[in-house]
Structures are given as C-alpha cells and as structure tokens.
Amino acid sequence: MASNLSAAGSEVKVHEQARYVDTGRIVIYVVLICGAVVAIIPFFLTVSWSLMNLSEATGQALLPRSPQWGNYAKAWKEADFSIYFFNSVKIAAISLSGQLVFCTLAAYAFARMRFPGKEFLYSLLLATLMLPEAVTWVPNFITITWLGRVTPIPWMNNWPALTIPFMASAFAILILRQFFQQIPEELWDAAQIDGAGHLRYLLQVVLPISKAPMMTIVIFGFTGAWNSLAWPLLVTTSPDWRPISYGLLAFLDEAGSQVHLRMAGSVITLLPVLVLYFIVQKQFIEGIAHSGLKG
C-alpha cells in the first residue's frame, strides 16, 4: 500500500511539473509573439504605405488597393539616390573588407597566441563595448584632422575618413575569438606536425570552418556602415561623399506631405540590408549560437 501511495505521489508531481513546464512555454511563446508583432508592424506599414497613392497614404489605410510600384522609381529619381546609394556601397565594401581582415587577425591572436599582457589588453577591448559610439566621434575627428595635416593623403571628404574608423570592431573580435577558442587543439597540433605556422593554420584550417561567425560579422559590419549618418556628416562637407542615409534624411524634408514617396525612399534604403540578411540568415544564426552570445 505504501508503494502505491508513493507511486501516486510521484505521478502527481510529474503532472504538476509538466503543467508548470507547459505554462512556462506558453508564457515564453506569448512574449515572443508580442515582440515579433511589435517589430514587424512598423516595417509592414512602411512597405504598405510605400505602395499606396497619396490619398490612401494620408488616409491611413492599411493595404493599397492597387500597388503603385512606380513610387520606388519616382522616389529614387527625386531623391537622387544614385549618388548616395553607390557611396554607401563603397563605404560598406571598403569598411567591411578591412574589418574582416583586422578583426580576424586580432581575434586569432587573442584566442590562440600567447604574449605578455594578452588578458589585460582583451579586457580593455571589451571595456570599449561599454562606450557609446558618440563618445568616440570627437577623438576620431581630431585624429582624422591631424592625419590630414601630417600625411600627403587627403582624409576629409575622402574614403579613408569614411571607412577606416569602421574597420575596428570590439564586437567582431569578441564573436570571432569565442568561435576560434572552440576549435579543437588537435587541429593545431596536426598543423604543426605538417610544418604550418600561425598564418598558414589560420588561412588553411581556421577560416574554412569559420563561415558562420564570418557571416555574422558581415551582417553587423555591413549594417553599421550602411546606416552610418553622424560620422559621415562630421568628416564631409559635400553631399557628393555622403551615404544613402543622408540622402534619405534630405528627401524626407523635400518630399514633405508625400507620405507614400517618403515611405518608398525608406524601403529603398532598407532593401540592401534585408537582401543580405536573407542570403546569409542561416550562417548568421549559427554564428550567434556558436559564439556563445545567444540569450
């Protein structure tokens, strides 16, 4: 009889635990769904209004009766997006290329090499993640101005000032270092037996298996460079050097009450980032998971 009571008690506990787990999952799903809805609604309205005519957009309709695809061409032409768009492409491409090279080398050094003060330097690097981006604008601007005086290279109103500050990223180094540390030590031992040094090991062994974190860096690096606005305004005086974010800002003022064209300009600005994300989203998610940064 005692065994029956014990079994019954265990069964009740199991049911209570299952009920608790199910309730917890339901709460998590509800929170996630609410978060997704809050994130999606602004994007949905932007796309929807960009396809409306003026009367529909000012009437706050949710869906266009007849999609006006010509709004995108009209917004592109009126905002003169061609100059700003290709400026942003150049800024993002140069910045991202430099970031991948320098951050990969730095992350590998912190993950696999031994040198005096490594942990202290890495701690300082992580501390920079606490700094707001705006805090770095003044010292970077002073540095750029000084380099323009002491070197023959023109920095202001030129690609160096627009791209080099984006090539250093503590966040990128953190992600890559976390991944590099998870690579089995046996691979390094085997590479040493084959006579490989650190550079050959990095190029032939580490990088081929680091596609996921690399794509994560590509997403964050491209998005940061593409969306930059304040820094380009500081180091340029001519619109001919400014990115598409500046073009959108200027167009929002010029378009005035033409809500549909303003939304079309916003979609044009967002499109490259969205396309890139959908191309590499699988590797991006894997990179976040493997880096140990998932929530």
What are these regions, as identified by a protein language model?
Residues 24-295:
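A structural signal for multi-pass alpha-helical bundles of membrane permease subunits
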Residues 1-21:
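Short, Lys/Arg-rich, polar N-terminal cytosolic tail immediately upstream
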